[in-house]
Swiss-Prot record:
CDD domains: IGPS (cd00331). One of its GO terms (molecular function) is indole-3-glycerol-phosphate synthase activity. The keyword Thylakoid does not apply. InterPro entries: Aldolase_TIM, Indole-3-glycerol_P_synth, Indole-3-glycerol_P_synth_dom, Indole-3-GlycerolPSynthase_CS, RibuloseP-bd_barrel. Keywords: Amino-acid biosynthesis, Aromatic amino acid biosynthesis, Decarboxylase, Lyase, Tryptophan biosynthesis. This is Indole-3-glycerol phosphate synthase. SUPFAM superfamilies: Ribulose-phoshate binding barrel (SSF51366).
Length: 267
């Protein structure tokens, strides 16, 4: 595990401990479970939204609402989650990915609530999930999907987090960085398999990461390529390899209008 990832996970454990002191788990769980059928807050179907786009011959784009990153610093000074989400929705995005990590990505729970509330798209809580508390928390914030990072979790905990999310009606995107993590990911029930093209140790990005893993992917998995999609040539390279789901952040966040850039990139 990389030093930066270890540092992030230590902070996450502290965050969960602090959150539990403010609100106990039974109370949080009860609220999360009550939202299964709540108008406007019930899960919107993250996987379904991706598959519908792909079935229509389009790319399934998970468009990121991200202010900053540890490696690149602030990506977007004028950061208005509602406006970004509306722009994505009107320019063909399938889903949103909203950073909720405060300390490393300058994200916030409110960004998720505001972005999802401004458009009809399902939203991923993009964060480092290490505890069941965060899964219930994600649902109360409106998340339709959570991210599970194989490099950050032991298999038992990962399965427990997935089961909790599925029970609440959410989808799960499991993320791998290399073939050494694939076996653990494939033991989960979720069909959503993300491949992060960014090396968590060096922060270098290579689209070969996705392409190298493709031969090892079962046919029933929906592969999402993450990081490093910066131009139309990158999109073409992936789609030529039969990868049609993308998680893109930086390219959109640096553009004057994120949604317009999405439409241009995936034209």
């Amino acid at each position: 595990m990389s030093d930066i990832l270890q540092k992030i996970l230590a902070v996450k454990a502290d965050e969960v401990a602090a959150a539990r002191k403010k609100r106990d788990l039974p109370s949080l769980r009860a609220e999360a479970e009550s939202l299964r059928t709540e108008p406007g807050l019930a899960p919107r179907g993250f996987e379904r939204a991706l598959r519908e786009k792909i079935a229509a011959g389009q790319a399934g784009v998970i468009a990121e609402v991200k202010k900053a990153s540890p490696s690149k610093g602030v990506l977007r000074e004028h950061f208005v989650p509602e406006a970004i989400a509306e722009s994505y929705a009107s320019h063909g995005a399938a889903c949103l990915s909203v950073l909720t990590d405060v300390n490393f990505f300058q994200g916030h729970a409110d960004y998720l609530k505001r972005a999802r509330g401004a458009c009809p798209l399902p939203a991923l809580r993009k964060d480092f999930m290490v505890d069941l508390y965060q899964v219930y928390e994600a649902r109360t914030w409106g998340a339709d999907c959570i991210l599970l990072i194989v490099a950050a979790l032991d298999p038992g905990l990962m399965a427990e987090l997935e089961a909790c999310a599925l029970e609440l009606g959410m989808d799960v995107l499991v993320e791998v960085h290399g073939d050494d993590e694939l076996d653990a990911a494939l033991r989960l029930k979720t069909p959503l398999l993300g491949v992060n093209n960014r090396n968590l140790r060096t922060f270098e990005v290579s689209l070969d990461n996705t392409l190298d893993l493709l031969p090892h992917m079962p046919a029933d998995k929906l592969v999402v390529t993450e990081s490093g999609i910066l131009g139309q040539a990158d999109v073409k390279r992936m789609r030529d390899a039969n990868v049609h789901a993308f998680l893109v952040g930086e390219a959109f966040m640096r553009a004057p209008d994120p949604g317009v850039e999405l439409a241009r990139l995936f034209a």
